[in-house]
Amino acid sequence: MKLHLRMSFILCCSLLIAVLGMGKNRIKVACVGNSVTFGYGLNNREQTCYPAVLQRLLGTNYDVRNFGHSGTTLLTEGHRPYIQQTEYKEALAFKPDWVVIHLGLNDTDPRNWPNYNQHFNRDYQLLINAFRKENPKAKIWICLMTPIFHTHPRFESGTRDWHAAIQQHIHDIAKANHVELIDLHTPLYSRPNLFADALHPNAEGAEIIAQTIRSALTGDYGGPKMSPLYADEMAMQRRDPIVFRGTANAGEQVKVTFLGKKETTKVKTNGQWEVSFPAMEAGGPYEVHIATKAKQRTIRHIYIGEVWLCSGQSNMEFPVSQSISAHEDLATAAKQPLLHLFNMYTRFPTNAEKWDETTLEAVNNLALMGGNIWETANENTIKNFSAVAYHFGKALADSLKVPVGIICNAVGGTTTESWIDRNTLEWQFPSILYDWYHGDFGQPWARQRALQNIALAPKTALQRHPYEPCYMFEAAMLPLKDYAIRGVAWYQGESNAHNIELHARLFRLLEKSWRHFFHRQKLPFLVVQLSSLNRPSWPEFRDSQRRLSAKLPETWLIVTSDLGDSLDVHYRNKQPVGERLALQALHHVYDYHLVSEGPTCIKARAVDNLVYLYFENAHGLQAKGGAVQGFEVAGDDGVYYAAKAEIEGESVIVSSDKVPNPRAVRYGWQPFTRANLINSASLPCSTFKKKIAQ
């Protein structure tokens, strides 16, 4: 019995020593910050704030403490300096091994940044040095601030600008003080629904912060991963550097072998790696072997050629299987060995229905797009692929004789504003972000359909939808980040035809946004003009698209007014649209000497009551199907009357007995127009309006 008691006593002492030893050797982590660190506004704050979540993620070998204090500033002369708070003194006394600092949000207050910004770097350095003094071996990370969104009451009066300025200072401070930088902005910037007050993240947001910090502290980014774009049958852009990139655990060696050449790189502290090989001409199939200590992967059937993005709304999304040419297309698809398709389709169509809880949550999580695999063309792979994009890619491959990759991420009903990145709208058009569902920027139909879809959401003000500003960029464009493409084929506008001036402003921003995103300031845009349909605003909208394309650099128009259906916005004759897109690309992007667009009016001159219209691209000018139709003229009163028109060489002579002194002429100005002017290439003339030179 005594022996048993003695052994039990020894065992208990051993366990106690082990526990005490474990506690002594635990890595002490201090989370220093403001209300976001503290967990302001969170239910069950002590369990849901990011330091508490970080403790659970790191485990028992770490001792994570929350030293956040709401409302505090980094600036020592700010309205509530962090260094004057009890939490600061407690954090120093903790003598942490690791320090994570997230400060700066409250420095955007007008009491602080305008007056004391010149001291921000100095004060941050003092804070860093204070922790180093307490523990010279301490590792310190400072954080790029979490976002402040547009609904913040001072967003446009200073907060937006000062937040951006402080972020740049934090970059500089990290570099100058040799501390690691944790980006808390990027993983949350596309998630405004997690910030009810535009400033403080909810529990899900706090978890994202904790996961981001945990990866930065430990270097554990979940092992080797690559974008779905890097897969068998992929197409890569010729004459651009051949770049392979992905994520892996920090510090790992990544060895990439491509065409007999081997490159080795070390994964950065943010988990990113990238290897680049010299640009190549078209060719394939090739393969690449990517190896880390934990995993090896071979990607096969890589082709180098031309890569295009086809995007927009439902007429770009419209599948091959529903088009007029479906039977022939499906039967011959396998005869397109050069064509490689990457279909990003919507998992949740915006039909006239109320979405259930699962769908609402997935949409909020930006999990809208499905597919995401490269496929070669065959009957099964093209049937649900965009008909316009398929015929565009097919025509390019037939002409260029090189592999052609087509990425399609079009989603029906989406608005122009939904495809523009958040930063662009915050700085160039912030008013469109405010309560889009109930404002008057969005098309009434689009807003009503969106509200119908999200009707069962517990908080509709925070519920995301594909039609709202920025959503499609965040769900369907960010997955393409840094992937090289040649250009964009864009077919959208039906959901913005209610406000022509607004669309013109938005489309300019979209081009600017995407050119910045793809790192190509001269990224070509091939724009499909709206077709004919009995909607009253469409003639003027078509003309606006014409004028935009003529004015904007590297932008070319594809006319489709001869293909529409008077009653159905989704006309089925999509093959000519894709082929006309290819003509514009071949001529303007690839320098083919061919006719790529229809007659374009360049001048109007009046002689008495006759109007002489002069055209370019007018070789073989003719009227399809009989007499010329679609012209109208107006006098000083601005009232238009139907006009007679006769073709004379490469000109058209227009007149009306009701307009003795014509001052303006227009063409194809009916919503569903039967205007029929074409050239020898059978390409149609666009809807247009022109003042008459006297």
Where does each model-flagged region fall?
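Alpha-helical cap/lid subdomain in secreted, periplasmic
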Residues: K2, K24, R56, H79-Y221, ...
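Bacterial Sec-dependent N-terminal signal peptides
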Residues: M1-N25
